[in-house]
Every structure is written in structure tokens, then in C-alpha cells.
């Protein structure tokens, strides 16, 4: 028999609502969706909506779901709360969490009752929207209304904490939950193990695995995948392979996610041949590689200038019906640009729009850098203009890439215009930006202007780094200003920045 949860739950809520700083927020104060237009689709009788919920709900689009909701609230007698729960759950699976919250509020206004199931759906939507303060506030409301939280309720909250990088709060709630007499299931353990692994706390995750097994809960493929991914991310390659052996001995077989984690680790460590071996092992096990598998392998091949093989892999994935996304395209375009085959990259860039793949900031930035390195600045600037025209927002890396290209080619005035535009658009320059400008000015012999930029850094709230000092000192030396360069060297050491090998 579980002990009453009210006192412990309330103390937990108080602690966490204070943390989030939003204890008084109600669901409706943060979420409202205006302007939903419900088309009045004709339903011949009350059984039609039940037929839709029973057989057609998996294939429904959002508009159809909204039409169905509108019809259901018009029915007399009203459909059961179980029917409403089924519909809300389906919309939640579409990841339209804000819509679920809105519809739940409409149900409240219409006096449609709720149960634990509908409450759990709403609470999960708050967590998925990263609105943990609202989720905790709503948990308090649930308890007041007499709905005792279930293991599903806690699962949603734990997932919300882990997704919000609040794994310690997740562990605290886990302990409170166990203290109240709830028995965690494999899903609960998996949620926290995954959160710990993503927070680089793999040893704690392994401890929790031991605790899980002592509690008589057997790990599944999801448990092992989280641990293998965490071990790989922490560079513990041998531990990861041992974990694979361990799961296989228990007759828990690796899936596509497992192999993707191993391939990712191999590629990051430069062990592309081993990554290919894992890929071949997948094929032997009759596992279909997914877009992540292919993208990782293409990245590894491009990294080692094996472009012909990367192209072949790209073509092969398409032939298998696995169509590349923006990430895959960007990887291969980057491979071409780094191998000085920027025109091949441009061809792929054009192919993206033909295939309906939307280019993102990374794609544009890669191509701009490719043309800058090829000395084709006019093309790079044109791509930048097209990017802005298409509504794709340049980030600081995009600006720095373009500025680097302009400064390297002696176009300092144009670089300063771009810098001014960037600041006008609300983008704050970072120390890398100013290092690029200082380097460009020094290279062009405009050391006095570079010095002015250097002196303005404090006013911009920026601290010079090793590259700022290095570049500025080189510029001063080249101008014969040795005394000024030596003074700057001393200033650098006073600031606690150690000289690199170029200046020792």
C-alpha cells in the first residue's frame, strides 16, 4: 500500500516551482492558440466519430483531427472521456503539443470532464514543450482534484527534467517516487539512464543499471543503446564494445540505433574502416541502415577525402529508397568544398531544391566558405544575398566565414560594411570576428587601424585571446614597431594568456 503522496508531492512541487520561478503560472496564461478555423465536416451520426477513432485515427492529419474534435463537442450525448483521450493522444503523437493544450482548455470551458488519462496527456505536453513549471503546477492541480499520479505521470515529468538538462531533479523525483511506494518500470529506468548518459554521467548510469537489475527489472535494447551511446561519447570505446557483447549474451540484439552509435564513435575517432565493418555487420543481420547510418558513413569518407566512395554511398542510399535530408546533402557538399570541387558542391546545392530539400544556415555557410577558399568572392557574396532573400538567417559563423574570405583577399572596406550590417541586424560580433578584421588589416599593412580595433575590444565587452595578441604582435613587428610589440607581449602575460610556440 502506497503512503499518501500529498505532503511529499507538495514539498517537491514547492521546491521545483521556486527553482523555475513561475509558481503562479496557469496553463492558460502561457498557451493560447487563436484563430483555429474548424471546417464543419458532415458526420451522419454519432457512430461515425467512433469509427474514425477506432480505425482511422493513425492516418489522420491535424485538420481532420480538429474537424473531428469540433464534431465530438457538438454531439449529444457527449462522447466518453475515453474517446476524447484517444483523440488528444493522437494529436500529441503528431507532436502538436500546443494544440492539445488548447483543446484541453476548450474541453474545460465546455464542462467536459477529465480523468487521469487526459491529465497525463496534458502534463506530458507541457513537459514536451519544455514548460516544466506549468507541468509541476498542473501536477499540484491534479492532486487537489483527487487524481493520484500514476507511473505514467512520473514518467512524463522525469522525461521533462532529463530533456531540460535537469537530471539531478529527475533523480530527486525518482527517489521521492520510490519512497512513496511506486515501483519504477523499465521505461522509468531507461529515461534516467539516458538522461545521465547525455549529461556525461555514464558511471552514475551504470550504477543505476546495477540498481535496476537488483530490483528485478531486466534491461532492454533501449537501456543498452543509451549506455553504449554514452560510453562512445565519453571515448570509452572498449567499454562500449563490452556492453554490446553483454547484451548479445543476454539475447538482446543490437538494432539500428546501436550500430549508429558505434559507427558514430568510429567516425569521430577516425576509424572509418571499422565503421564500414559495423555497416557490413548490420547488413548481415538484415538490419536496414537509416539516414543517420548513411550520413555518418558519408561524413567519414569525406573526412578522409574518399569522395568517390562517398558519392557511391550517396547514390546507393537513394537506390534503397532512403532519401538524403539537409544533413546528408550538407555533409557531401562540405566534402566537395574541402576537396576544392566547389562546382560539384553547387550542383548538389541546386539538386536540393529540385528534390524539395530545404537548405539551412549550415548548407549556405558551407558553400559560401567553399567559394571564399576558391577565391570566387563574387559568387560567395551572391550566395550570401540569396540566403538572406530566401529567409534563411545567417549566424555568427556565416558572417565570420564571409568576413574571413573578404579580409584574406584584401577587401577590408567591404568587410567593414558587412560587419556594420551584421551589427545593424542585431548580431553581436564575437572575438573571432574581430580577430579576422585585425588579421585582415595587419595583412594589408593597415596596422594603425588594426590597433584601433584592438583598443576598442574592452568597450565591446570582449577580451582579447591568444590569436588577438598573436596577430597584433605580428603586425607590429612587421611594421618595425618592436617596442610596442614587446609591450603587448608583456600585457598578454599579465592577462594570464600563455604565448604559443610561434612567439616563444
UniProtKB/Swiss-Prot annotation:
Q: What Gene3D superfamilies would the database entry show?
A: Tetratricopeptide repeat domain
Cite a GO CC annotation: mitochondrion
Query: Positions of the PPR repeats?
Result: 45-79, 80-114, 115-149, 150-184, 185-219, 220-254, 255-289, 290-324, 325-359, 360-394, 395-429, 430-464, 465-499
- Major location, coarse class? mitochondrion
Q: Tell me the residues of the organelle transit peptide.
A: 1-43
Q: Does the keyword Repeat apply?
A: yes
Key word Transit peptide present: yes
Q: Which family does it belong to?
A: Belongs to the PPR family. P subfamily.
Name of the protein described by the UniProt record: Pentatricopeptide repeat-containing protein At5g16640, mitochondrial
Q: Which organism is it from?
A: Arabidopsis thaliana
